[in-house]
Structures are given as structure tokens and as C-alpha cells.
């Protein structure tokens, strides 16, 4: 045994996470010239403006991947990603400043979508990307 080593029994069944939460699949296109990496719990609606996707569908969601992992987008990439709704208090602060408050507050979604347009974040309806 090494110092700090963990000895973990193998689970007898698969670990299930995010059960009962809303999910969606999005096609994301990277139009920039540098790789972009997005962490597991970043509010996907607010990711780099060079990623083009339906931000309205991504509002209030993060990547449906294990905590502490990330998805990398290379320049010119297009890929389908799976998102899951945030739980808890559903308050988002920081990131790119498009929400900075409660996701479910009156008019917050529309205010945030207006900010996407004003600040020229990549946004296209899902059907327009396919």
C-alpha cells in the first residue's frame, strides 16, 4: 500500500447519477481557432462564445458527465453532447455573467438570451445546425 492510496471495493451495480432530472442532447460546433475545454459543472449556456449551439436549450444545464471531468472541443469540431439540469438552489453566479442569479427568476431566461445576442455569443436553433 502506498501513502494516500485508496482501496475501493468494486460496486456490485452501476452507479446512477442525475436520476429524474431533465436532460437534452445538443449539437455543438466550434468556430474558434483554439481548443476549448468545458468542465462538468460549468453552466453550458455560458460557455465560450466560439461554441455555436442552441443556448436556449442549454439554459440551466451542465454536462452530464462525471464530476471533475471535462469535454474538449478542437477548432472546427462538431459533436453531440448530453446535458442535465442543475439541481439545488439553481442559482448561477460568475462564468460569463449572463445569469448572475436564480435561473428560475421571472424573466431571467429571456434577459439572459438577450445578453447572448447583445454580447455576440454563438447561438443557433438546434434545427439550423443539423
Swiss-Prot record:
Pathway where it operates = Nitrogen metabolism; urea degradation; CO(2) and NH(3) from urea (urease route): step 1/1
GO BP term, pick one: urea catabolic process
Q: Give compartment(s).
A: Cytoplasm
The record's HAMAP family line, in alphabetical order, gives:
Urease_beta (MF_01954)
The name on file for this protein is Urease subunit beta
Reactions the enzyme catalyzes: urea + 2 H2O + H(+) = hydrogencarbonate + 2 NH4(+)
Q: What is its EC number?
A: 3.5.1.5
InterPro entries for the chain: Urease_beta-like, Urease_betasu_sf, Urease_subunit
Q: Where are the transmembrane segments?
A: none
The record's subunit annotation is: Heterotrimer of UreA (gamma), UreB (beta) and UreC (alpha) subunits. Three heterotrimers associate to form the active enzyme.
Q: Which SUPFAM superfamilies match?
A: Urease, beta-subunit
**Top EC category:** hydrolase
Q: Which GO terms describe its cellular component?
A: urease complex
Instruction: Return the similarity comment.
Output: Belongs to the urease beta subunit family.
From the broadest rank down, the organism's phylogenetic lineage runs: Bacteria, Bacillati, Chloroflexota, Chloroflexia, Herpetosiphonales
Q: What are the record keywords, sorted?
A: Cytoplasm, Hydrolase
Keyword Transferase among record annotations: no
In its UniProt record, a GO molecular function of this protein is:
urease activity
Please give one Pfam family short name: Urease_beta
